[in-house]
Curated annotation (Swiss-Prot):
An example molecular function term from Gene Ontology annotations: 4-hydroxy-tetrahydrodipicolinate synthase activity
Family stated for the protein in its record: Belongs to the DapA family.
Gene name of the record: dapA
Leading EC class: lyase
Catalytic reaction equation(s): L-aspartate 4-semialdehyde + pyruvate = (2S,4S)-4-hydroxy-2,3,4,5-tetrahydrodipicolinate + H2O + H(+)
Protein name per UniProt: 4-hydroxy-tetrahydrodipicolinate synthase
Length: 297
């Protein structure tokens, strides 16, 4: 069995203050996740606005996450993707050297590699480090799909590639992956289908909603993984509206607005080209979060 990171995982937002990384706020957010039952924190992914962070900021976020989790059972799965393989290797090596327990590596964006190119890209990354590697498939954002045959090949050939975060939005894709390779760890990358993936053999979630409601995402995930599906479904059904609302605009625009409205971040700031939600959607988010018990620090 390959070493893996799984369970209830949070795709962390990155807070800014006066357009600078708000390090103190970021640390507080991570400690809140630890307090409320999350298994793994995932800094500097899509939700963390990694595309508009400087290289130094990216590294600082990884260091803060690792330091915040020291002395706890919570692990750090560091975002370490790039569309330049050499750059992805550099981030992966940094993450390993600074104590991350694994890396999340998004498929190369913009340059649209072939399946063979994807294979070579991920093989090079995996061979450069010892810690676990979770593939990240999100074709709607990056413009390329890591097809199942490529996933199986990487899983077989690379000792530390243990699974995939699936954000295609396709339950069928996840079932296909699990049916053909039962030992592959499939992680839900979309809150709307967390429960269907978990109940079909998925081994965890990387959740946006968990920024706001870590306790409920943790409960849902652990119940489902313990095959207590009826109890898990009750929580999932309760989260239906918030899950939909947090994707009313491009992620992470709504979740940051929700965190601000809940008093969990002091300022509502994004890095352009991301900007604040429309007035209509801001109001919608404000109304929806009133229906949920949001735990504090």
């Amino acid at each position: 069995m390959k070493n893996s990171l799984q369970g209830a995982m949070t795709a962390l937002i990155t807070p800014f203050k006066n357009q600078k990384l708000d390090e103190a706020s970021f640390e507080k957010l991570i400690k809140r996740q630890i307090k409320h039952g999350i298994d793994v924190v995932v800094p500097v992914g899509t939700t963390g606005e990694s595309a508009t962070l400087t290289h130094d900021e990216h590294r600082i976020c990884i260091e803060i996450a690792v330091d915040a989790c020291k002395g706890t059972n919570v692990k750090v799965l560091a975002g370490a993707g790039s569309n330049a393989t050499h750059e992805a290797i550099g981030i992966a090596k940094f993450a390993q050297a600074h104590g991350a327990h694994g890396i999340l590596s998004v498929a190369p964006y913009y340059n649209k590699p072939t399946q063979e190119g994807l294979y070579e890209h991920y093989k090079a990354i995996a061979n450069s480090i010892e810690i676990p590697v979770l593939l990240y498939n999100v074709p709607g954002r990056v413009g390329v799909d890591i097809l199942p045959a490529t996933v199986f090949r990487l899983f077989k050939d690379c000792k530390n590639i243990y699974g995939i975060k699936e954000a295609t939005g396709s339950i069928d894709r996840c079932v296909d992956l699990l049916a053909h390779e039962p030992d592959l760890v499939v992680i839900s990358g979309e809150d709307a289908i967390n429960y269907p993936i978990l109940s079909n053999g998925g081994k965890g979630v990387i959740s946006v909603t968990a920024n706001l409601l870590p306790d409920q995402i943790s409960q849902l995930t652990h119940l489902a993984m313990n095959e207590e599906y009826k109890k898990a479904k009750l929580i999932n059904d309760n989260l239906y509206t918030i899950n939909k609302t947090l994707f009313c605009e491009s992620n992470p625009i709504p979740i940051k607005a929700a965190m601000y409205l809940a008093g969990l971040i002091d300022t509502l700031e994004y890095r352009l080209p991301l900007c604040k939600p429309s007035k209509e959607n801001f109001k919608k988010i404000e109304e929806v979060i009133k229906n949920y018990e949001i735990k504090g620090f």
